[in-house]
């Protein structure tokens, strides 16, 4: 797995993707960014990385990062290329994640 300790986000050509964005057990105020119908329970960083690779988003894994709203939870994050708006990118990932979980 390609892990990078530091990734520069300057230039806004990269997007931070936290597993919490796709977690069906979280409310919007707790950090979920996708609609409930596209969210899954306990999304894993490895799943998100795999999906981002398939979508050609050039994901970089940062396992040592913690989602600010849940600083005690060390699930890590992904840094992906920005090909669309952040919302559209998250929806693309969420749709593929939902398909993967349902198959």
Curated annotation (Swiss-Prot):
One of its GO terms (molecular function) is 7S RNA binding. One of its GO terms (biological process) is SRP-dependent cotranslational protein targeting to membrane, signal sequence recognition. Gene3D superfamilies: Signal recognition particle, SRP19-like subunit. It is found in: Cytoplasm. One of its GO terms (cellular component) is signal recognition particle. Its main location: cytoplasm. The keyword Cytoplasm applies. Keywords: Cytoplasm, Ribonucleoprotein, RNA-binding, Signal recognition particle. PANTHER family: SIGNAL RECOGNITION PARTICLE 19 KD PROTEIN, SIGNAL RECOGNITION PARTICLE 19 KDA PROTEIN. Part of the signal recognition particle protein translocation system, which is composed of SRP and FtsY. Archaeal SRP consists of a 7S RNA molecule of 300 nucleotides and two protein subunits: SRP54 and SRP19. Involved in targeting and insertion of nascent membrane proteins into the cytoplasmic membrane. Binds directly to 7S RNA and mediates binding of the 54 kDa subunit of the SRP. Belongs to the SRP19 family. This is Signal recognition particle 19 kDa protein. It comes from Methanopyrus kandleri (strain AV19 / DSM 6324 / JCM 9639 / NBRC 100938). The lineage of its organism: Archaea, Methanobacteriati, Methanobacteriota, Methanomada group, Methanopyri. The gene is srp19.
